[in-house]
Structure formats: C-alpha cells, structure tokens
Amino acid sequence: MSNKLFPPQIKVAATYMRGGTSKGVFFRLQDLPEAAQVPGPARDALLLRVIGSPDPYAKQIDGMGGATSSTSKTVILSHSSKANHDVDYLFGQVSIDKPFVDWSGNCGNLTAAVGAFAISNGLIDAARIPRNGVCTVRIWQANIGKTIIAHVPITDGAVQETGDFELDGVTFPAAEVQIEFMNPAADDDGEGGCMFPTGNLVDVLEVPGIGRFNATMINAGIPTIFINAEDLGYTGTELQDDINSDNAALAKFETIRAHGALRMGLIKHIDEAASRQHTPKIAFVAPPKSYASSSGKTVAAEDVDLLVRALSMGKLHHAMMGTAAVAIGTAAAIPGTLVNLAAGGGEKEAVRFGHPSGTLRVGAQAVQENGEWTVIKAIMSRSARVLMEGFVRVPKP
C-alpha cells in the first residue's frame, strides 16, 4: 500500500435526469467549483471526470456516463442573461474514449428536462409557477444561440413527472412535455451559414475513395447531412447492430460526415472533424416500409411517412436525437429535399418517421419568402424525469 497522501474527493450538487431518449448530469452554474464556472480546461476536466472519460475501455465504469452517445452528456443551467428568457442552457457532449467535451451543438432530448430542472431548482420565479396547469419556460440555448420554449406540466405547485405519455425508445410512460424550437434554422451570419449552407436543397457530395452521393445538408436544430439509404446500400429499416457491428460502415459514414462538414463550412480542414464529433450529424432516409423495431414491435409502413436512421458520435442512434428530429421536420416541410421526397413530396406541416426504436412525430412551420425558405418553429413532444439528485463526487484536481 502506498504511503503517498492523496486529497479527498470534492462533491458538487448535481441531478441525474432523463430527457427524451437520453440521460445526463445537470448542474446549476453557481454550484460548480469556481474554476469551472467559466468555459475552459477546468470545466472540461471536471465534466470529463464526472462522466468517466476518457475511458480506453469505452465503458465509463468510473463515472456517471453510460458508454453511449445518449448517456455521455452534461448540462449547465443558470438564470438567463438574455431579455425575455428564463434560463440559459449550455450542453456538453462528453467523448467516451477521448479527452474532449464537444460544445458545438444542442441536445434536443435533454432539452425536455431543462424546464423541469429550472423550475425545481429555483431558476424560475416562483410567482410564475401555477399551482396546477402548465409552466411555460423560455430557454436560451447558449450553444447555438436559439430560443426554445418548454411547456412543463405542474401539479400541486411541483413539476409533474408521471403520466401516460409514451415515447418510443423509453420503456415507461411519463408526463408529456411539449417543446417548441423557435426559428431553428441557422442564421446567415452564424457558423455554417444559413439553413442550407450550400444554397441548395440537394447537392452532389463528392467523397474521395467512397463515391458521389445526393445529399441534403441542412442546419436546423443541428447541422445534419441526409443521404438516401438506397445510395448507401441500405433499406432504412436497419437497427443498431446492423450498422454498429460493421466497422467498415462506421468508417465510411465518418468519412462522408467529415466531407459534409467541410462542404457546410463547419470546419476549414478535413482533419478538424475528428474533434467535432457532435456536429454535423449524418442520417439516411427511405420511403415507408414495415419493419420490426428494436423492442420487437412491428412498425407498419402505413403508420409512417418515411424512415430515418441517424448516427451520433460515430454510432447509429438507438432511437433519434431530438435535434436531428428538428432537422427532419424542417427538411420534410420544404419541398424538394431528400427528406421531403422520401416522405412523398409536397408541402408538409408534420411527419411521423420510423426510427430503430419505433416512431416519432415532428412538425415544422416553413414559409418561402422571396425564394428563400425560413422555418418559424419546429414542435415535438418528449418526456423527462429526475432519476437521482444530490451530489456527484470527483477526485480533487
């Protein structure tokens, strides 16, 4: 046994929450150690240690992470610095096996838990919380500079978490939380340019050594590259193991994603994609087909408008990222995109798409002015609940 003295662990107030089909560790900014209250290496080091990364075993045994992109997540919330907003929401996607936290995008699934956490942790004026009803929480999504509105159910003055709303990819029902992503498309002066960074609804994406692909590259909710499943040799009915057990396929998707990121202006050199795993996402789409979901439940072709499979952090997602669902709903609403064409074409205000765990309905209000498409908002329902609250402990730096 070593005689060396080691400092004790520190404890930080935290809440472990499920939001949509993801889980993450939530913090109030004021509860973080002083050095971690500002962006930088101290904050990243703390969050990496909380989650249990980097882990060469890719299991995150020594932390709160669950060794998947859906469960290697952190959230920092504070009173909003923006007028007409309640809370600032900052999301950090923690790499599982590498020492970095990706701050380049939002997590749409955990967005469902932001309002509930803010209400329960004193970030919302108590006078605004009804005894019974719905509390509207205006969220400033600090990663992407966008407004999100969460409608959180309240019973007896507290967040209502239990209910009968069922979400494919989540085993148990809970209370429904409606979320509005306001003006979700990228601004002209934002990173990656406007909603369609290339100016086209469909581009030909040249990927050396792999091929040429028709692609819709959109920045709404989260930057996303959509490709036809057929062009990749898939049907759109694939489940996680079909893709994630194929290292060659994963490498191909990552190469396509990197070239798409370059084409979208998100990176300046192809090598930068390796340290920007959270964005852009890559997904493939197909017309409706019947298939068995990962739970064994049959998804009938007539029950969906299209099929979508998406990768997150280098792996096929078990359901669908909430931000990617915003991109799907937005692209579906705009005639001529690959997503819209897979859903049958024409003008659409909402679609129900099939994903590996089942189906999800998402709506978007899109308008065309002077030949340019804009999206007023995208809407979907998720659920959220507290799994554990108290303190997380980490070794003192």
UniProtKB/Swiss-Prot annotation:
Reactions catalysed: 2-methyl-trans-aconitate = 2-methyl-cis-aconitate
Domain of life: Bacteria
Pfam family, one: PrpF
Keyword terms, alphabetized: Isomerase, Oxidation
Catalytic machinery residues: C107, M321
GO MF, one example: intramolecular oxidoreductase activity, transposing C=C bonds
Presence of the UniProt keyword Isomerase in the record: yes
Keyword Isomerase set for record: yes
Pathway terms, separated by semicolons: Organic acid metabolism; propanoate degradation
Gene Ontology terms: biological process: propionate catabolic process, 2-methylcitrate cycle
Cysteine sulfinic acid (-SO2H) carried by residues: C107
Residue sites binding substrate per the record: S22, S69, S70, T71, S72, K73, N109, K281, S312, H317, G322
Function field: Involved in the catabolism of short chain fatty acids (SCFA) via the 2-methylcitrate cycle II (propionate degradation route). PrpF catalyzes the cis-trans isomerization of 2-methyl-aconitate through a base-catalyzed proton abstraction coupled with a rotation about C2-C3 bond of 2-methyl-aconitate.
Family in the record: Belongs to the PrpF family.
Remaining remarks: Together with AcnD, they are able to restore the growth of prpD mutant on propionate.
Assembly with partners or alone: Homodimer.
Full protein name: 2-methyl-aconitate isomerase
Gene from which the chain derives: prpF
